[in-house]
Amino acid sequence: MISTTIFPGRYIQGYEATKRLGKEAARFGDTAFLIVDPFVNEQLLPRFQAEVEAEVKIVIEPFNSECSDEEIERLAVQVKEADAKVVVGIGGGKALDTAKGTAHALGLPVIIVPTIASTDAPTSALSVVYTPEGVFKRYLVLPKNPDVVLVDSRIVAEAPVRFLLAGIGDALSTWFEADACERSYAGNMTGDVGSMTARRLAGFCYETILEYGLVAKASCEANVVTPALERVIEANTLLSGLGFESGGLAACHASHNGLTALEDTH
C-alpha cells in the first residue's frame, strides 16, 4: 500500500502574529487581496493594517456569509481586476474556505488567517462548498494546501469561548476517525491510506486537548494567552488539520454533512 501525507507550506502562530502578515504576503508579490469577515474588517483589521500596508498594497473585500460557488466566482472577478498576486482569507471557516476556492480558481497562492480556533479547516487543501442558503453541497478538493497559515493567539483569546470549545469538539473526533480509517484500510483525502505520521499527530491532538483543554478554556474566558491556550490552539488548528486530512474521515463528518440540511443547526 502507498500512504500520502500533505502539509501547508508554512504554519505561524503566536501573540500578535498578524503583524507578520505583510512580510509573508510580500513573498508572493506586491498586491494582496484580502477576503474578510465584516467583523474582521471593522474591529480587527485596524490593529495590523498599517504593518501589512508597509509591505504590500492591499485590496479589501468583505465576505458574504456562505462559501458558495456564486461567492467564489464573484470574488475571483474582483481579484483578477485588482491584479492581486496573493489571496488572503481572514476570519472564520467559511471565509477561509472561500479564500482558498478563489485562489484556486485563479491559480494564485493563498494565505489563511483564522480569527477563531473553531475548526481544523485552515491548514487543509479543501473547501467545503454550500448552497447560498447554507446547505452542504460538495467538497472542493484542491491541488495543494495553503501556502501560509497564520494564527494570532491574541485574537483567538479574545473571541467568545464557545468557538474554542467547538474547535475542541471537532479536534477530539480526529483521532477516532483516523483510527477507524486505519482499522478499515480506508483512504484519506488524497485517496491513499493514512501514514503513521498522520495517526501519531491525530493521537497527539487528542492527548493535548485532554491535558490542556480545561486550562485553555479558562484562559479564553479571561481573554488571556497562556501556554495551555497556545497548545490547544495548535491542536485545534494544526494537529487536527493534519490528522483529519492525512489520517482520514469517518462517521463524524458524515453526520455533520447531513445535519446541515436542518435549519436549526445554522
Describe the function of each predicted region:
Residues 9, 104-197:
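A glycine/threonine-rich phosphate-anchoring loop and its flanking beta-alpha core
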Residues 20-24, 47, 74, 101, ...:
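Alpha-helical scaffold segments in soluble metabolic enzymes
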Residues 11-19, 42, 46, 69, ...:
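Electropositive phosphate-/nucleotide-binding environments in soluble metabolic enzymes
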Residues 1-86:
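ATP/NTP phosphate-donor binding region
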Residues 189-266:
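Active-site segments that bind and position negatively charged phosphate/pyrophosphate groups
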Residues 18, 41-45, 69, 94-101, ...:
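Short glycine/serine/threonine-rich phosphate/pyrophosphate-binding segments
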Residues 79-102, 106-115:
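A short, small-residue-rich loop immediately preceding and capping a beta-strand
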